[in-house]
Every structure is written in C-alpha cells, then in structure tokens.
C-alpha cells in the first residue's frame, strides 16, 4: 500500500501499533500510535506504555489513552537522542504487549547539530503530550540555514564560487533571499501535467476525494491512489532545486491538489508544517494550467519571510483538535492579518504559466485571492519539503510529523489494486 510513509506494524490483538518508519528505519521524532479495530475498545481508556530496551535505564513512558482518538493515543521519542543502531521497542496496552525492532539512522551535518542541541538543552527522550515549538531552542542563529543568516548574500557568493549552487540558479536564489520566493518557468514535464490534471478530473467526477464541484476544497492524499501525484512528490527536478537551496537532502511531507483557488486568508506555513531548526521547510507549488485573472490567484507578500513568525506558544491558545479551528482563526489568523496591515507591503498577484514552479520560504505570508469568476479553474498542486536531519512536527495540532519517502519503491500496490485482489480472492 502506498501511503504518507511506510508503517512498520507490531500487532497483538486486540490492539496494534503503528510506527513512523521506512522499512524499519526511523529518524527524527518517532511516533508510536496505538490503535484498535474493536469498536468496544475504541472509546475505552487504557494504559499505554512504551520502553526502548537498549536505551539508558528508565527510557520509557506511559500515558492513559483512548485508542479511537488519533490525536492523543500516541507516544513519541526523539531518536536524535539515541546513537544510530538497532533498538527494541517494548509496548504494552492493558494486558497486551509486544516488541518491535527498529533501526535509528540520523545522518548528516544537520542531524548531528540537532542531536548536539537536544542533548545540551536536556530535551526529554519521550513526548507524551503535544509537540510544541517551546521544546526547542529556535533562537540559536548558528542552527539557521544559510539563507536565514545576516550575511546570506555573501554566503551565496561562496556557494557559487565553490560550485555548490549552479550559476543558472543564482538569480532565483537571490530573489529568495530578498523576497522569500522564486519562480522557475517550464519546470514540470508536460506529460506529467496531463496525468495530474486527468487524476484530479477523475477524483472530482467520481467523488473519491470528497470534492464538491465548484468549491474551493483541496484534494488531499491523492498520491495514495494516483501514480501521477506520487510522481510529483518525488519529481527529481524539484528535489534537486530544493536540495540545492537547503544545501542538504530534503523530503516531501505531503501533496495537495487544487482544481479551484482556495480563497485562503494570508498565512505562514511554519505553524502547520513545523521543523527544528526553523527555516528548513519550504513550499513547492506548480501551475497545471495558465492561471487567469479573477480565478482566485495566489497572493504573495514579498519580503514577508523576514517578518515575525507566529507559533502556538506566541498565540497562547490550545492545540487544534478534532478540526476545531475557531479559536485558531480568532487569534493566529488575526495576528497574521495584523502583520500584513502593519507592513504596508502591497500584495503581489501571481499568474504563472502552465508548468511553472513557485518555491517559497516557510515564513512567507501568502494566500488565495477571491474567485471573482467562478467559471475559471486554477488547477495546481503543492508539495511541502523538509530538510532531512531535522525534527518534523505540526505546531498547530501538536502532532509529530511525517514525510513521503523519496526513495520508496514505486511497485507498491495501490489501494485500488489491493481491493481488486481481495475481491478476486473472495469471489473464488
């Protein structure tokens, strides 16, 4: 099955756990999720405990959870605080218990920096409550990416001189330094664009995505069913550009399709798609048709990536759960709009040609304009990319983050194929 990430599962009825892993390898913040398929147990509280047997004495955590509540029925651990190697995870739920073997593999300069910082700040190994930006020392300038340093233009000169940034990307990267975004025209292969558009049309017509015709709804998790969306998340040209920008390998965490403009208010992505160290996430948006005036075009506020970043601890509100966003809208979104109003920056309406790639900084203020002509579509898709070696979490909801494995085998069966095979077996 193709999913957000491959899940290495340990199962002991009536409970099972899912671990964020790829073929048994774990990195960053590792989430261990307790689930049950027994309807009678889904809303029944149980003591859930996790222990890492090879870790220092006392490396365990316990919490009381309700398996049917996905937002709270998990325990996570910072794998950066462990040496790379194989570990045994012992878990228990009520009278049930089992073990899972995983391999911790945090590699690269960024991972080493994060590990050192977590040890220095005595960040706990286990998390049993919400993930929050207050856990990490985001004010350490040494941890920021090169493009967020005061001498970023001089650093770009060095990267160009040493060949770590090709000359053809210089103007794009300088615009990123000054304005927080850049565009590369004719980026996406025309054949892939046709496949992406066909997939969205099919999803909208069949209702598979829950899309309501004419609405501004997003098409989520399309890569699970449609190969074209899987391909765009691992598109080599996009990966190369973002890896070069970050100066470290990156991985996409999601892909979203759009048939129409979102009409979304100005916002920063970092509160939803969060990373430590800050700065190591960016959006990659691709136009799947020529964007027309009045279609609900993207709106960008150039230079807003240098504005204050609003996180949940700054807003002083509870994490969002069960899709209850009203408090978030009344606090965080109000603060975003205040930043826009106080800046005096004129919004830029973005009307790209088909196949153009737009890359933006995690702090860039952007949104969707009003759809003045509802007959016009604005077909596009977006992926968000994290640098490998960082800690991925979602500050708005307090959940550990996940990624789409860039090197995963593409011969994995789709859900549709699995359903067909099951039907054939049952029909025999």
Please report, for each region that a protein language model flagged, where it lies by residue.
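Short, compositionally biased P/S/T/A/G/V-rich stretches that sit at domain boundaries
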Residues: 1-39
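Surface-exposed, short loops/turns at beta-strand junctions within beta-sandwich domains
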Residues: 79-85
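Edge beta-strands of extracellular beta-sandwich domains
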Residues: 97-106
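Non-heme Fe(II)/2-oxoglutarate
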Residues: 117-161, 310, 314-318, 354-359, ...
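Non-heme Fe(II)-dependent double-stranded beta-helix
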Residues: 126-178, 184-268, 272-277, 396
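Short, conserved beta-strand element in jelly-roll/cupin
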Residues: 276-293, 351-354, 359, 384-388
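Double-stranded beta-helix
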Residues: 294-365
């Amino acid at each position: 099955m193709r999913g957000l990430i491959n899940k290495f599962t340990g199962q002991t009825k009536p409970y099972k756990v899912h671990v964020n892993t790829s073929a048994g390898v774990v990195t960053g913040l590792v989430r261990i999720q307790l689930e049950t398929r027994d309807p009678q147990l889904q809303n029944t509280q149980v003591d859930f405990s996790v222990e890492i047997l090879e870790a220092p004495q006392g490396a365990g955590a316990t919490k009381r959870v309700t398996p049917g509540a996905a937002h709270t029925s998990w325990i996570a651990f910072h794998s950066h605080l462990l040496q790379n190697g194989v570990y045994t995870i012992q878990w228990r739920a009520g009278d049930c218990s089992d073990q899972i073997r995983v391999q911790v593999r945090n590699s690269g300069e960024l991972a080493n920096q994060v590990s050192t910082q977590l040890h220095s700040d005595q960040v706990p190994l286990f998390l049993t409550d919400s993930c929050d930006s207050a856990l990490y020392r985001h004010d350490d300038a040494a941890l920021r990416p090169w493009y967020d340093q005061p001498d970023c233009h001089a650093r770009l000169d060095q990267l160009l001189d040493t060949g770590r940034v090709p000359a053809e990307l210089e103007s794009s990267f300088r615009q990123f330094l000054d304005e927080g975004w850049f565009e590369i025209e004719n980026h996406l292969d025309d054949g892939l664009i046709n496949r992406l558009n066909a997939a969205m049309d099919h999803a909208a017509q069949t209702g598979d995505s829950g899309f309501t015709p004419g609405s501004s709804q997003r098409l989520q998790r399309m890569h699970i069913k449609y190969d074209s969306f899987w391909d765009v998340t691992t598109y080599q040209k996009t990966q190369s550009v973002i890896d070069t920008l970050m100066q470290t390998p990156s991985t996409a965490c999601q892909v979203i399709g759009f048939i129409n403009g979102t009409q979304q208010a100005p916002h920063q992505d970092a509160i939803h798609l969060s990373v430590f160290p800050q700065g190591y996430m960016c959006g990659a948006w691709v136009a799947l048709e020529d964007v027309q005036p009045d279609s609900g075009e993207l709106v960008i506020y150039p230079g807003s990536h240098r504005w204050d970043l609003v996180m949940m601890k700054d807003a002083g509100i509870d994490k969002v759960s069960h899709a209850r966003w009203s408090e978030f809208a009344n606090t965080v979104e109000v603060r975003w709009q205040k930043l826009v109003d106080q800046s005096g920056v004129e919004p830029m309406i973005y009307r790209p040609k088909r196949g153009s790639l737009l890359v933006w900084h995690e702090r860039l203020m952007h949104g969707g304009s009003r759809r003045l002509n509802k007959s016009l579509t604005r077909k596009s898709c977006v992926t968000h990319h994290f640098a490998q070696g960082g800690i991925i979490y979602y500050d708005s909801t307090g959940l550990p983050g996940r990624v789409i494995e860039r090197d995963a085998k593409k011969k994995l069966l789709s859900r549709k194929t699995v359903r067909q095979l099951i039907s054939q077996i049952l029909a025999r």
